[in-house]
From Swiss-Prot:
It comes from Oryza sativa subsp. japonica. SMART domains: ENDO3c, FES. The keyword Iron-sulfur applies. Residues 347-416, 1288-1309 are annotated as: Disordered. This is Protein ROS1C.
Amino acid sequence: MAKDENPSYLHLIFLSSRIRVFILDPPLSLPLSHGQCELQVVEEAAMDPSGLNLQGNPAENQESWTSGVSVGRGTPNLGVGTAVAGRSCPSSTLFPGSSLSSTALLNTMHEGSFPQTALVAGSVSSADEQHGAPPVRPSYNLPAGCTQVPISILVFHRRLTGRGSRCRSPQSRSFMPAPALSGVSEADGAYGPIPQSDFLSLRGPSEVFPGDMAMNHSEPATSYGYNSEYAPMHLQPNGLYTEASNTESEREASQLQQSAEAVICDSLSKLESAMEKIQGQNPQESSGLVAEGSADDNIHKYHQKAKRARTQITHSDKIDLPTQAVSACKEKTITQIEMQIADAERTEALKGEDAPAQKLKTRRRKHRPKVIREDRPAKKQMATTSEEKPLNQKPKRKYVRKNRNPSSLEKCAEPFSDHSISRESRTTVRSSIASVRRRLQFEFGEHGVQRDQSSMTNSWYQNQEKPVNAESSLCSVTKSSVQVEHGQELHMENSPEGLFFGINSKLNKILDEYIHLPEAAPKPSEQIPLAASGHVSEELARKQYDVRHTHDPDSTSYNIERSGLITTKGHKKDLDLNYSNTNGFQMYCSASLLPEMDSTKGSMTKVSKMDKNKKRHYGGESSLAGTQSSIIMRTAAEMLAVYQACGIKKKRSARVRRNSFLSVMDLEKNTSQESTRLPRSCMEALYESSYIKFMTKKRSQKARLNSPNSIQPNIDQKNRFSSETVFSGGFNGLKRSEETFQKTLPQIPDDKRINLDIHCKVPVESSPNTSTPPYMDYLQGVTSKFRYFDLNTEQVHKTEMHLSQTMPSLSSLGATNYLPNALVPYVGGAVVPYQTQFHLVKKQRPRAKVDLDFETTRVWNLLMGKAADPVDGTDVDKERWWKQEREVFQGRANSFIARMRLVQGDRRFSPWKGSVVDSVVGVFLTQNVADHLSSSAYMALAASFPTGSHGNCNDGIAGQDNEEIISTSAVGDRGTFEFFYNGSRPDIGLNFEFSMACEKIHMEPKDNTTVNELTKGENYSLHCKESAGSLCDHETEIDHKAKSISDFSAVELTACMKNLHATQFQKEISLSQSVVTSESILQPGLPLSSGMDHARRNFVGSISDTASQQVGSNFDDGKSLTGNDVTANETEYHGIKAAATNNYVVDEPGIPSGSSLYPFFSAIDCHQLDGRNDTHVSSTSPNCSICSASSNFKIGTIEENSSLFMPFDAHLAQRNGNMIVDTNLSSALESTELPVKLLHCGKRSCYEASEFQDHESLYATGGVIPETATKADDSTLKSGFASFNGLPDTAAQASKPKKSRTTSKKNSENFDWDKLRRQACGNYQMKERIFDRRDSVDWEAVRCADVQRISHAIRERGMNNVLAERIQKFLNRLVTDHGSIDLEWLRDVPPDSAKDYLLSIRGLGLKSVECVRLLTLHHLAFPVDTNVGRICVRLGWVPIQPLPESLQLHLLELYPVLETIQKYLWPRLCKLDQQTLYELHYQMITFGKVFCTKSKPNCNACPMRSECRHFASAFASARLALPSPQDKRLVNLSNQFAFHNGTMPTPNSTPLPQLEGSIHARDVHANNTNPIIEEPASPREEECRELLENDIEDFDEDTDEIPIIKLNMEAFSQNLENCIKESNKDFQSDDITKALVAISNEAASIPVPKLKNVHRLRTEHYVYELPDSHPLMQQLALDQREPDDPSPYLLAIWTPDELKDTREAPKPCCNPQTEGGLCSNEMCHNCVSERENQYRYVRGTVLVPCRTAMRGSFPLNGTYFQVNEVFADHSSSHNPINIPREQLWNLHRRMVYFGTSVPTIFKGLTTEEIQHCFWRGFVCVRGFNMETRAPRPLCPHFHLAASKLRRSSKKAATEQTH
């Protein structure tokens, strides 16, 4: 018998004589292990080929058959043919229940006489009793060699009994029975309708659809089931069934056995004689040819099968059968009969021309294709034995078409019926017609996957392409069914011959991407292992099914695998794909190719025949060779897979993702060159063609047709098929689009034109288990846009296709809610049936989400400038609600700051030095890393590129770094001469003299309304004189005229203005790539004159630190210097821009430089830059560092500004020390000339006016500026510039309407960002870069340095290569866009504009930008980093959506996205002032490092635990035993809790301290039976001595200054109650009330594990505090401490037993008592300790405060550091200095905590210890080299990290603990 998972029928055919077989009626009951066997014998006499005409109408066959009459329910009707009408007895039927004779017949079968494997040619025809239709004679062809032999058909019909399936013998090679029919029950016994084909159809019961019978309505569905419950029936001669008596059955039992033996023996003898005759005619084909049974094999490919040994079929049940029938047929074997039948089939196929009814092509070339590989000899196919064959193979189907005209392209044959082919028996019933096509199968069972994987892989590589005839028909109607496991079926109907598509793999790739490939040559064959090709895994094995269809001798087989390969030929031949499903939809795809090359023939170039020497290589993907034109629909990733499979290494940098796009490409026509390109990378191979253009796509963007020669219909890979996209239902109505697109653009050549036509058909039937939206309607609308595809020109419109846009995305659904039979996308774009749920990630941790309401989102959009409505709107209720919300958050912020001040100290705003560029680079370094690493990286970068790193001019030789470029440009009528210097940055205190001598320049107006032009000034010469006396001459040629000027005595500048209109002049001073612009406004009536007899104007200026500085001043009638409030009107002008002085009166002889006032002229600090103007002339004076004009300045020392936020507008007279600058609004002044001398005087400088000469006067005419002495302008306030430092007013900023222009629009590449700089420079008084805003790094050197050098400097931070490249690109952008590395103008632009500009910088996100704005630009902003976001969630400031029931808040690992937290917080914090926002942010950062860490937070010491929801959740879980999540990582702890490790602790694992006031206290007992023994601790001498020292040294310390923090128990109880209610919905209010008790501060804690090896976390050292006046400060030459630095210098003393260069405990090496003194060995512990105790000096290390070490300049206002952080001097750490003991007697002693980072130092400390550390102690995490100012690791003497412990030290520590 046979074994299968779902066997139902077993068919055998016997060739017999014409003798009638009388089978008696007594039923046979054959006991089997898993079911019963029903035997049916049908005699078929005088059978000739005409009676079995396949191509004839089945209705014609019915005429020659006698209708059977149905008697009884479920009884099969066996029709009797007319050929046997004259006989006396029709065929008899053996029903179940027969005893002896049936047993004898079966015994004969079991002895091996029956050819059970391949003798299948037909089936029993029966009629359904319910329909009452006459039985239909099965339509099949018999082998040609057996036409003269009468055939009787013996059918074994097995009926399942529900007890499983029978076991097949290992030696059996029987065919695979068809699956059991669905819906069959034992009660009624009526089997469902069978498929239309025959008994051996490959279809299972799930494939029976009404559409199958609709193909041929003349063939009614027949059923051949029988129920054994009914009495056995006997077919009488008149065709009626009657009941047979039991006695009659017993009498005829013996006759049955004899008749069966006679039938078998006679049939075999007749068959042998017929086969011998056939063998004589065709000796070369005597051996059987068996078709491959693999799902990927072509049924036309055969292999010689060696004759097998005799196989005996035995049953699992050892049934003793008679052996009489065995001896009669022992000589015959199953193999011989199988081979004979196969030869008979082939003989019949060769004699096809003899059949008069089949007028088809008579010629058929017998070709046995082979794949010859060059790398190895051809593999000989071995005979496949039954042991190698999997168990659940299904037979193939035979497709035979009617006779047709091969040359006709319009005439198509009628649909033919499917005929079965036994795959297991390796036989094929073939006819002389063109093609036989097998079916695709989905076999996803265990055996289906294991089924002949090697055969699948081998056949994949061994397929050889056959030539294609261009004239072959493309319209023969075929049909292919795709079987899905659970009954789903996909049909591909009305598909042309030359186009087959694997629905299993690429149904969704029809419209994916179109790549035009002409003539691609085959790659050399290469054996690929299974692991490399990807055919081993189950998933990949599912996708390797393909369809191969064979045409006429000149035809080829097309392989449509996962890549969706479609090859078309012919002239304007539409190729239609019809994917249909009875319960699904039908989709037609028509692709037409117009003539490509051979236009004279009216068709495309024919596909040449494959050369025998050119072999096809399949590397896991389908490939096409030998075609001039083809359409290959595949993705770029799939093309790369071809190259990868060929053994080509793929570069990591050349990775192409699945979402990338591959343009339409033309490969070279010469196919012989393809083989020479194998050792290339995949990207090199793709880039090889000049027509290939790769376009990368961001995830958030869509495809753009932005390149010629490209067609990119994009299908979103993620949304192509959702989880609910089922191809078998959910659609109603029948629609089909007949629209075709035959128009093409005029510019499209004929050889590059594609017309795509897509028709969609939706059947009426709908599936009840799906509810998918109308899919095809949307597809029709999208495909209608697929009109014109131009392969050579760029399309104006974009074509985007999303097959399932209306359906939920696969990723969005989280791989849930999959239907059982859903087709889902898989790797490579294949579509596979869904069996189990997809797991996109192994374990996806839940992430909390912020519960954002609509109002919050609306206000956020308003604040971000995404809407034009006012912030609060017009609704009074909303405004009142927002006011309450902001009051609540203001109270929370104030409470948090006040609480943190008690613990972490005062962290109010204290400005640090530094520029905006420093902060921008600082936020680059602080991203996604700890602050101590990012700060060290910036310190290392500053040490590698210190300021003033450029060399000076040596011996008159100018290098690249000190080259001065003076550029001249002319734009239209406007000429601009720009001069600059490039030299070293002189230190403060150096004096320079700089003079500019020009020809006499006259400024005369051309008319009364236009601007003035400088009519002369062709030549000028610049001279710079250093105080040392060196002179560098600079001569510049203008207008190509060189003239040396020796008269440097005077400069005349005359301006005559007679109009009342504002005139603007600008003088641009540029150096190399830098342009420094100063725009000045000349008001009418302002003559500026200077006599020739005046002395030369010299000045000495102070130096700014950036590469460019705005130089200039504003001129207004009667307007004084008003800083930021001055507004200027930009007017178009022609001529040279010149700088002029402002009209102001200086009451006191000086202008404070530390104030917000812009100086008259700024000192220019320049570096070598590239000139952006047309002409530039180089000069060689690096020392020229001061630019001069016709004025003299003096710099004097001033007192520092006492008030930080001194508003400029509120007080026009600003006091800075003893210097006051007032404004004079006089309108009577007529002329002005102000010589000012600029001098350097120490670190602080100011501008001081020199004496006025007699002929110099100051005039001002007309006052144009309103009085601003008392208040600022409202518009200025609303613009956010009410204060001098650009800090916006809070109320005005909040109420200001936001711009409607979005950020994305401003961030476009076309936006001119330099316009913001020009506006800031033109609208406001020009501002000098003050000393506090200088750069801390030589950014010009960083920009010009090698990226590797930058990367090496920041290597310890991580991501150094990426960040180094970003930093350098950022600096290059500044030079390119703005001409200099300067962003100080961002302080003067509106906050929104500054924000948009910063967001446009690559690498800066919202958090980084907000950090720069708040901490550096001092704008109103609140950045939300990881610390802030985590704290806000835990404190309950930000509401989150409900978490899963199994997840408590304290177990949450993934917090919400930071942007969503900021979206909720900022609308509620936007009303706070800048100082509050700064301190709130700084305190939260420190709080997140010290207390509220990400993992293992120090909740018991947290001062905010009463309001914390995280602590309430953890407390409730530990104390009240809330339900814990079902986690596999749960461990049973004996004496500690592990809730902080992400697991819920065991409630009763540790005895808890008693809660005060608990009503259940008497019921709580600790499970500790050990006796309690209390004994006092022995006092130690060390502690007593230490206490004494503390009393002596710290006598003046007041410990009461440290405040005591008390826990708010009421708030804690309320918070705990809310947490319990949220976590446990089942708790009643009474239970919660009982659970909540009065908890004290001591009891309000959660159990935490005891920290081990605390010394590895931190090391505590006592140090001495050095005052500023200590003599040691001068002896060590330490830098002056910064005034704002709260920390002093410290001195750490080494104890006598601490040796400087050892980490191990010291050991004595001598005995002082015996030797009588101290030895001189420095390593002797005893002697050294004694000597140091007696010595008057001690060894020590200096600790430098962080702010002083950085000289007060650091990015982001120094928030990287703690306020009490110090650095250990690297030099004195390794070589301690000697300090006299008497200098330390009166010093205060403090505690310093050394460690690797702040979080590790404070881990496990109590609140009081943390308080003491911040109030009285210090922290130190790094060393510091005071010479190079670079960070260094801590000396092991102070702290040795656990990661740096030696193995020996660890062992020693372990021994000491034991």
